[in-house]
From Swiss-Prot:
It is an enzyme of class 2 (transferase). ATP binds at residues 1126-1134, 1154, 1201-1203, 1274. Residues 1120-1396 form the Protein kinase domain. Its main location: membrane. The lineage of its organism: Eukaryota, Metazoa, Chordata, Craniata, Vertebrata. InterPro entries: ALK/LTK-like_GRD, ConA-like_dom_sf, Kinase-like_dom_sf, LDL_receptor-like_sf, LDrepeatLR_classA_rpt, MAM_dom, Prot_kinase_dom, Protein_kinase_ATP_BS. It is a single-pass type I membrane protein. Activated upon ALKAL2 ligand-binding. ALKAL2-driven activation is coupled with heparin-binding. Following ligand-binding, homodimerizes and autophosphorylates, activating its kinase activity. Inactivated through dephosphorylation by receptor protein tyrosine phosphatase beta and zeta complex (PTPRB/PTPRZ1) when there is no stimulation by a ligand. It comes from Mus musculus. This is ALK tyrosine kinase receptor. The gene is Alk. Residues 441-477 form the LDL-receptor class A domain. The chain crosses the membrane at residues 1043-1063.
Length: 1621
């Protein structure tokens, strides 16, 4: 078949390709320019799954930023410094335009179909167009920068705007601002994601765009350069070099070889629309019609060939844009398509190739799988029928362990053959998270003349730039050790501490050496004058960890001159987490040096942590050499370059000897270049040394060991005399690294504790041993047990039938006569060498101490380990029992264990035990101490101590273990042995490369296989562990939905039912509780368990100490009996009760029980508990004593001492002298009551406690008769300040205004002087016999009265000295008020003054007590019930003229006769200063005592006016009595004068006009300023705690009742004109 045959087959081929490309694959789409309708939009979920895998991610590690900043960038310049000489950072993202424009199809004026690589490459450098990249703000917010590339961006970047259509070769995004910010100020890594634009996505569009992006070779370009250098944007500029050269570095990040292909779960996909990553054999040609190679045939070219039949319209519809891979050959050959390197993590990885099936008879297709470093295998291809003559060949690739490539071969039949391939793909080759591309960060250094060098060529002591700017000044600024020529000293290299006679490394000039251009100073070591074998080590500075996969190199020059009978090694020590690993990276051993400087470059691979270098030199006698090093440098590639390639094959395992862990302080000899082959050892071979069947204090014999080892690989020589008697001598079979495990012997058991013994210690170390080395091994033997014994007497002690030892202990508290019963100490295991006839210890595993006769079961003796051979190996201290033997000590005691140099024999039993009953418990061979009643000490490097006194409970101590500095401790010392000791020697298998540091060697393949923890399996790399994949069962979606729906419905039904049941139950309980609480009698027997919590204020304390709930004395409820009710308190009912079962009081104690209702708020519970805490902390005869509390059951109780006399106020009112009722009270009784309260206040003052409410209502009496004692009994106002919630209180607070000083209610200041003021008011209450202070004044009026300087007049018949105490307590300044010690002293003076105590009490003519007490009580809920206030009613005019005006009220001016004692009080009050206006008409006016004979008409009248109407707040309120009286006709003009006088005084009395009933009684500036114009401004202040109500008056409720405007009794007060101040 000729060329005509090919043309005949081409039209149906292209027609079929047109159909298949739209139906069989999802990677083809119609061209918008050609007219076909758009394909359906891609589903959103499908797009989301693929978008991440379609992106190209550039991730620059954060370490790059850190290293670039530390190595290259100077410190940030201040704004004032010049810009010249500084460094700048720039960045860009570049893509080739050719693959991107191919995706868009034919464009007007631009032709890419001819295969041109770029437009006009001969015109000069490749042109580029720069687009704006992302912003720093976006990067900082999203932690990454996403650049979306679509058709519009491609047209803008590669073609330009419509007015200037000019194709360029490179599309760039400017990232300079972003990179500059990140390198200077950023944190974390820099992530830039380039992905297809999502706008108007069509089926397959994003996949094609992603492939085009990858084919355009996206690369990230960074540059750091000095000002004036050429940059990425202007590489052609070559300025003149300045005096000081700066860095000019460029980085390119792009996908690295061999893993170039797209990583996603769809693998590689190539439809030949644009260049793919496939390789072709023979090479691909796009020009001409070669008959021997593959060729692209675009659809446009087929259209121009006019090969299709039919109308023109059909051509455009059936031939979409795109290309096909065609092959036309007549040769008998193979043509291959080769995929890039791939990886597969899925068993479903499949190869899919679309070919034309009509061409199949002319040739055949064969697929090959080519794994890395493995033989290839054929992939079976199975055809799948397609449309229009096309078929898809599919073959299973699977999951190869190594990277692989796939080759598709077309084998022609010899005749003219035609092959057409439309689609080549590797699908479903990854599961889970995509592994991502391997990005390489390539670095370069630009010279001033434009020469570009690799970064590794800079700072390598070799001048590559014409002017030498790649060396010298720039490199010398690197950190210490990076660039070292030793011209300025050691460059951070240090030497290990050496003795004075040891040779030292020196920095000096070496003369008479063939320098070959080398001049200057170097690091030198001379061995000429050293006769013995020695070594010297010098250590470099510490270097940071290199970047992962960086081409890190070490460059150095070295020289050996003279004869060196030894070797020189360069060791790299890596600082791993918790340990150090070292490996030899360079080694040389020679007899005679060449005296030439030699340059060496070493690759530093697999360094993942901080590291340092060590130069280790060893030489023997006869060495006369000089060793030198110079020009040592670490390549900058270590920290500024990422190769992106794996440095180790995935199936290779690290050599254990290369990862051997060494002690950095150890000067060990390198064994890398020892002559002779390295032996391949059998990992199952080991040498186990035992006691050879010997036991007791002496070691084995040669015959015993011959019998014990006759069937093993061991051959030992046993010492027969001297210190080596019983020591096994063994020759090392081969030079290698060995692990030596030493196990000390256990101690003997005691007579009474036969369950546990003290275990021997295990020590495992790693040592380098040479073939023929002699090891001396002493295996420790177990100490003898005390029981069982053949001696019948001793056996009876063992079984407990004989207690003679216990009897002696009971009588004498020690054991002497019947000594014995303690176990012997265990022997230590010694492994040592001989050096010049002197033993040198390698490993010593200590023996366990012997248990004592009566040893305790649980004892713990920590393991002790020594590694310093300069510590003396002494024997343990001996007492009655023997101490353990050490390394090189002497002893003369028979029962003490011997040291190794004395033969290490075990000690005998103590002499008394042998003499009394022959109880022998000897120590084990290896220095175990003999036992007595106490245990013997264990052997070791330092022997264990025995008890100094024969304590039958004191065990012997374990010995101290030892490991030589020549070895490495592999495991810590552990107590594990329960019998005789052992020594196990085997080849060391290093497992430090494994993730869990555990491994084993396969006996057949001799490969190291790592172990993994439970639940994990070994990964393919043979090192790391991964979670074993467990197939998750997939249930049907319908079943899952039905189960979830059913569960949800059931949960809702159960929840609703539960809520209804709980609600109904709670409702019933609440109803029952309400009925119970509303019942007349409360069932006190109903008790339930409960707890209460509170928090006290840490700023306050009681009596100088803090308080807590635990300080309260809890009284069991069963000991409390309630007798009768006493009344209602602040919280609940108060009962009289009895408490039985009190300590030191057999009779029941009478108490008062304060209760807290079960149903109460949390605030009430906290207040109740705080009051109990306060009262319980006081201990004074004048403060009510707290007997205890009962808080564990409901209702909660506070038990106080029973005060049968009641409260003081009620007592005074009930015992007032009346005309028909004389009283037994005298003035002295009132003074005694005042003295008692002052004593209690003094106690509170001394303990820094502020009561805040000293009033008669809060004081209680022990009894009403003679001998009464007054006590302070209520701390209600003190609760808040001593609770943490005091500072959180807001809103309305209740304050006892009439007992408070001005600074308290004006500024909220409470001190002990506050209680002094309150005590003065209390005195007024006592000597007025229970009257309310400030009679007839409301709280608001009291505020105005006190702040204006007014004070109360003395009560009737009040002695002058007593009133003087009151006035002193009422001083305006707190510091002028006396303390309670002075008050108590003055009261004592009053009790001794005859004029005071003989003063008669006034006779009461007012209403009886029963009438006064008929006042409304405080409701439980103050807000639930309006206060019972009496509204003022206008008096009838006819009643105004009925009653005459009382004489006492007609002339209250200066002409009025003052009551007795008033003169003294007035004098005291006048001494304080002039009375302000407004205080004169109400100051010192006492309405209660100005009416000695009240007219009986006051109690007559219709309705409610024939009895006084009073408002009394039992806690903080005030008395107000509205007493109707018959009015008399005042003299003409009297009333106007009174009103004028009141107005002139600035105060309107009750008769001046009614107040508004709805006004709130609050202290507001407007209220005071309106009524007190002459008061200074400093007195008009806000309260710091918000609104404050006085006397339970809430905002919006009426004030206290005031008199009617027509009340003559009150009007008469206003008729008198007071003189002005």
């Amino acid at each position: 078949m000729g060329a005509a045959g090919f043309l005949w087959l081409l039209p149906p081929l292209l027609l079929a390709a047109a159909s298949y490309s739209g139906a069989a694959t999802d990677q083809r789409a119609g061209s918008p320019a050609s007219g076909p309708p758009l394909q359906p939009r891609e589903p959103l979920s499908y797009s989301r799954l693929q978008r991440k895998s379609l992106a190209v991610d550039f991730v620059v590690p954060s370490l790059f930023r850190v290293y670039a900043r530390d190595l290259l960038l100077p410190q940030p310049r201040s704004p004032s410094e010049p810009e010249a000489g500084g460094l700048e950072a720039r960045g860009s993202l570049a893509l080739d335009c050719e693959p991107l424009l191919r995706l868009l199809g034919p464009l007007p004026g631009i032709s890419w179909a001819d295969g041109a690589s770029s437009p006009s490459p001969e015109a000069g450098p490749t042109l580029s167009r720069v687009l704006k990249g992302g912003s720093v703000r976006k990067l900082r917010r999203a932690k990454q920068l996403v650049l979306e590339l679509g058709e519009e961006t491609i047209l803008e970047g590669c073609i330009g705007p419509p007015e200037e259509v000019a194709a360029v070769g490179i599309l760039q995004f400017n990232l300079s601002e972003l990179f500059s910010w990140w390198i200077l100020h950023g944190e974390g890594r820099l992530r830039i994601r380039l992905m297809p634009e999502k706008k108007a996505s069509e089926v397959g569009r994003e996949g094609r765009l992603s492939s085009a992006i990858r084919a355009s070779q996206p690369r990230l370009l960074f540059q750091i350069f000095g000002t004036g250098h050429s940059s990425m944007e202007s590489p052609s500029e070559t300025p003149s070099p300045p005096g000081t050269f700066m860095w000019n570095l460029t980085w390119t990040m792009k996908d690295s070889f061999p893993f170039l292909s797209h990583r996603s779960r769809y693998g590689l996909e190539c439809s030949f629309d644009f260049p793919c990553e496939l390789e072709y054999s023979p090479p691909l040609h796009n020009h001409g019609n070669q008959s021997w190679s593959w060729r692209h045939v675009p659809s446009e070219e087929a259209s121009r060939m006019n090969l299709l039949d039919g109308p023109e319209a059909e051509h455009s519809q059936e031939m979409p844009r795109g290309s096909f891979l065609l092959l036309n050959t007549s040769a008998d050959s193979k043509h291959t398509i080769l995929s890039p390197w791939m990886r597969s993590s899925s068993d479903h990885c499949t190869l899919a190739v679309s070919v034309h099936r009509h061409l199949q008879p002319s040739g055949r297709y064969v697929a090959q799988l080519l794994p890395h470093n493995e033989a290839g295998r054929e992939i079976l291809l199975v055809p799948t029928p397609g449309k229009h003559g096309w078929t898809v060949l599919q073959g299973r690739v699977g999951r190869p362990a190594n990277p692989f490539r796939v080759a598709l071969e077309y084998i022609s039949s010899g005749n003219r053959s035609l092959s057409a391939v439309d689609f080549f793909a590797l699908k479903n080759c990854s599961e889970g998270t995509s592994p991502g591309s391997k990005m390489a960060l390539q670095s370069s250094f630009t010279c001033w003349n434009g020469t570009v060098l690799q970064l590794g060529q800079a700072c390598d002591f070799h001048q590559d730039c014409a002017q030498g700017e790649d060396e010298g000044q720039l490199c010398s600024k690197l950190p210490a050790g990076f660039y070292c020529n030793f011209e300025n000293g050691f460059c951070g290299w240090t030497q290990s501490p050496l003795s004075p006679h040891m040779p030292r490394w020196q920095v000096r000039t070496l003369r008479d050496a063939h320098s070959q251009g080398h001049q200057g100073r170097a690091l030198l070591l001379s061995t000429t004058d050293i006769l013995a074998s020695e070594g010297a080590t010098v250590t470099s500075a510490t270097f940071p960890a290199p970047m992962k996969n960086s081409p890190c190199e070490l460059r150095m020059s070295w020289l050996i001159r003279g004869v060196l009978r030894g070797n020189v090694s360069l060791v790299l020590v890596e600082n791993k987490t918790g340990k150090e690993q070292s490996r030899t990276v360079w080694h040389v051993a020679t007899d005679e040096g060449l005296s030439l400087w030699q340059h060496t470059v070493l690759s530093l691979l697999d360094v993942t942590d901080r590291f340092w270098l060590q130069i280790v030199t060893w030489w023997g006698p006869g060495s006369r050499a000089t060793v030198g090093f110079d020009n040592i440098s670490i390549s900058l590639d270590c920290y500024l370059t990422i190769s992106g390639e794996e440095k180790m094959s995935l199936n290779s395992v690290p050599k254990s000897r290369n990862l051997f862990e060494k002690n950095p302080n150890k000067e060990s000899k390198s064994w890398a270049n020892i002559s002779g082959p390295t032996p391949i050892f059998d990992p199952t071979v080991h040498w186990l040394f035992t006691t050879c069947g010997a036991s007791g204090p002496h070691g084995p014999t040669q015959a015993q060991c011959n019998n014990a080892y006759q069937n093993s690989n061991l051959s030992v020589v046993v010492g027969s005399e001297g210190p080596l008697k019983g020591v096994q001598i063994w020759k090392v079979p081969a030079t290698d690294t060995y692990s030596i495990s030493g196990y000390g012997a256990a101690g003997g058991k005691g007579g009474k504790n036969t369950m546990m013994r003290s275990h021997g210690v295990s020590v495992l170390g790693i040592f380098n041993l040479e073939k023929g080395d002699t090891l001396y091994i002493l295996v420790g033997q177990q100490g003898e047990d005390a029981c069982p014994r053949a001696n019948q007497l001793i056996q009876k002690v063992c079984v407990g039938e004989n207690n003679v030892i216990e009897e002696e202990i009971r009588v004498n508290r020690s054991v002497h006569e019947w000594a014995g019963g303690g176990g012997g100490g265990g022997g230590a295991t010694y492994v040592f060498k001989m050096k010049d006839g002197v033993p040198v210890p390698l490993i010593i595993a200590a023996g366990g101490g012997g248990r004592a006769y009566g040893a305790k079961t649980e004892t713990f003796h920590p393991e002790r380990l020594e590694s310093n051979s300069s510590v003396l190996g002494l024997n343990g201290n001996s007492g009655a029992a023997g101490g353990g033997g050490g390394w090189n000590d002497n002893t003369s005691l028979l029962w003490a264990g011997k040291s190794l140099l004395e033969g290490a024999a075990g000690g005998h039993s103590c002499p008394q035990a042998m003499k009394k009953w022959g109880w022998e418990t000897r120590g084990g061979f290896g220095g175990g101490g003999g036992g007595c009643s106490s245990g013997g000490g264990g052997g070791g490097y330092i022997g264990g101590n025995a008890a100094s006194n024969n304590d039958p409970e004191m065990d012997g101590e374990d010995g101290v273990s030892f490991i030589s500095p020549l070895g490495i401790l592999y495991t810590p010392a552990l107590k594990v042995m329960e019998g005789h000791g052992e020594v196990n020697i085997k080849h060391y298998l290093n497992c430090s490369h494994c993730e869990v540091d555990e491994c084993h060697m396969d006996p057949e393949s001799h490969k190291v296989i790592c172990f993994c923890d439970h639940g994990t399996v070994l990964a393919d790399d043979g090192v790391s562990c991964i979670v074993s994949p467990t197939p998750e069962p997939h249930l049907p979606l319908s079943l899952i939905l039905s189960v979830v729906t059913s569960a949800l419905v059931a949960a809702l039904v159960l929840a609703f039912s539960g809520i209804m049941i709980v609600y109904r139950r709670k409702h019933q309980e609440l109803q029952a509780m309400q009925m119970e609480l509303q019942s007349p009698e409360y069932k006190l027997s109903k008790l339930r368990t409960s707890t209460i919590m509170t928090d006290y204020n840490p700023n306050y304390c009681f009596a100088g100490k803090t308080s807590s709930i635990s300080d309260l004395k809890e009284v069991p409820r069963k000991n409390i009996t309630l007798i009768r009710g006493l009344g209602h308190g602040a919280f609940g009912e108060v009962y009289e009760g009895q408490v039985s079962g009190m300590p030191n009081d057999p009779s029941p104690l009478q108490v008062a029980v304060k209760t807290l209702p079960e149903v109460c708020s949390e605030q009430d519970e906290l207040d109740f508990l705080m009051e109990a805490l306060i009262i319980s902390k006081f201990n004074h005869q004048n403060i009510v004593r707290c007997i205890g509390v009962s808080l564990q059951a409901l209702p909660r109780f506070i038990l106080l001492e029973l005060m049968a006399g009641g409260d003081l106020k009620s007592f005074l009112r009930e015992t007032r002298p009346r005309p028909n009722q004389p009283t037994s009270l005298a003035m002295l009784d009132l003074l005694h009551v005042a003295r008692d309260i002052a004593c209690g206040c003094q106690y509170l003052e001394e303990n820094h406690f502020i009561h805040r409410d000293i009033a008669a209502r809060n004081c209680l009496l022990t009894c009403p008769g003679a001998g009464r004692i007054a006590k302070i009994g209520d701390f209600g106002m003190a609760r808040d300040i001593y609770r943490a919630s005091y500072y959180r209180k807001g809103g309305c607070a209740m304050l006892p205004v009439k007992w408070m000083p001005p600074e308290a209610f004006m500024e909220g200041i409470f001190t002990s002087k506050t209680d002094t003021w309150s005590f003065g008011v209390l005195l007024w209450e006592i000597f007025s016999l229970g009257y309310m202070p400030y009679p007839s004044k409301s709280n608001q009026e009291v505020l105005e009265f006190v702040t204006s300087g007014g004070r109360m007049d003395p009560p009737k018949n009040c002695p002058g000295p007593v009133y003087r105490i009151m006035t002193q307590c009422w001083q305006h300044q707190p510091e002028d008020r006396p303390n309670f010690a002075i008050i108590l002293e003055r009261i004592e003076y009053c009790t001794q003054d005859p004029d005071v105590i003989n003063t008669a009490l006034p006779i009461e003519y007012g209403p009886v007590v029963e009438e006064e007490e008929k006042v409304p009580m405080r409701p439980k809920d103050p807000e639930g019930m309006p206060p019972l206030l009496v509204s003022p009613q206008p008096a009838k005019h006819e009643e105004a003229s009925a009653a005459p005006q009382p004489a006492a009220l007609t002339a209250p001016g200066p002409s009025v006769k003052k009551p007795p004692g008033a003169g003294a009080g007035a004098g005291a009050g006048a001494g304080a200063g002039p009375v302000p206006r407004g205080a004169a008409d109400r100051g010192h006016v006492n309405m209660a005592f100005s009416q000695p004979n009240p007219p009986p008409e006051l109690h007559k009248g219709p309705g409610s006016r024939n009895k006084p109407t009073s408002l009394w707040n039992p806690t903080y309120g005030s008395w107000f009595t509205e007493k109707p009286a018959k009015k008399t006709h005042p003299p003409p003009g009297a009333e106007p004068q009174a009103r004028a006088g009141a107005a002139e005084g600035g105060w309107t009395g009750p008769g001046a006009g009614p107040r508004r009933a709805e006004a709130a009684l609050l202290l507001e500036p407007s209220a005071l300023s309106a009524t007190m114009k002459e008061v200074p401004l400093f007195r008009l202040r806000h309260f710091p705690c918000g609104n404050v109500n006085y006397g339970y008056q809430q905002q919006g409720l009426p004030l206290e009742a005031t008199a009617a405007p027509g009340d003559t009794m009150l009007k008469s007060k206003n008729k008198v004109t007071q003189p002005g101040p």
